[in-house]
Amino acid sequence: YCLSDANLKYLICGAAVYKGCNRMAKRVILAVAGAGKTYHICHEIDPQKRNLILAFTHENIHNIQKELYDAYKCMPELTTVATFDSFVYHELILPYEPSIGEHFGQPGFVSCGICMIDPPPQRIKTKTGKSIANPLYEPKDQLAHYITDRKQYYCATLSELALQVKKKRESLIKRVAARLNMFYDCVLIDEFQDFREHDYDLIIALAKQLNDVVLVGDYYQHSVSATNNSGRPFKKKSVDVSYDEFIGELERAGFEVDITTLDKSRRCSTEVCEYVSNKLGIEIMSFGTNPGSVIWVDENASRVLEDPSIIKLVYKGASRYTFRAMNWSYSKGDTVDAACVILTDDFEKLADDSFSTNRISVVTLNRLY
């Protein structure tokens, strides 16, 4: 259906009269590793309502779809599942392309798709290592900042573009939120700790306008991804944002922060959770449903390395090893019967009572966690 903004406002007003004025619900659920974030999202939705579930990667989407099938034996007819990039492109960019063209003084602009290459950086280095202005870089107030010479949108700048555009004095975000509120009863975002910079800013800006939004994530799994792992909201300039500071920022943005619903791990045993809490200083408790122990391998290291049933977790470069290995960051969310964690020099004295995390980077700690 094609609706003008005027008709859209009329329909929303009509819906408000019909349904009554509901208080806007904005909730963040902070979880621990293995607590079942995706399980919770998929089993707590009302399948009779119009749900929009967003996630960062295609792997996240696959897990969500699988969980929905397990929960309801089919994909709920009124529930939409999409990656965040796909959502931004199809819901915030394409429907408003005429407004985008007008905003940048190019009425009649028509794009030619999207590309995954990165836009030109603002500065580049010469052969001698000197940093200079990049002649190919376009400023943010120009449409060329967001599209290629072939009029393809840069996927990397979709959120930045959505935040930039206005029609007269009304932001694109406000218009999009009004449309989303009409077509969806609830918006849920999984693994929200993976979103950074403009993506994060866009989520917060939209959430302020949406009637019902739920974000689920684990603060201590931020900066674990191989990409998109720096900047807002977990860094201010070069300083890491603490757990309590992060909660405070969310509350100031208007969210109710829930730290109890998913505060126990279903995957990890009591002993493993206690070890993580004591050694890494990250509070995590267990449901106690799975057995498991922390075993230091000293004498039988070769036997463990040669056992294909035990996956070896290495900091990076898993493909270089002859045994079955996976990088710490890529193992996030997986469930296995046995894993051998191969430690780096930072954790050489992890078994000692005097071990301290004071000089270990947040990124390294989160990856081991």
Region locations from a protein language model:
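The feature marks helicase ATPase cores and/or their adjacent C-terminal helical subdomains
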Residues: 1-369
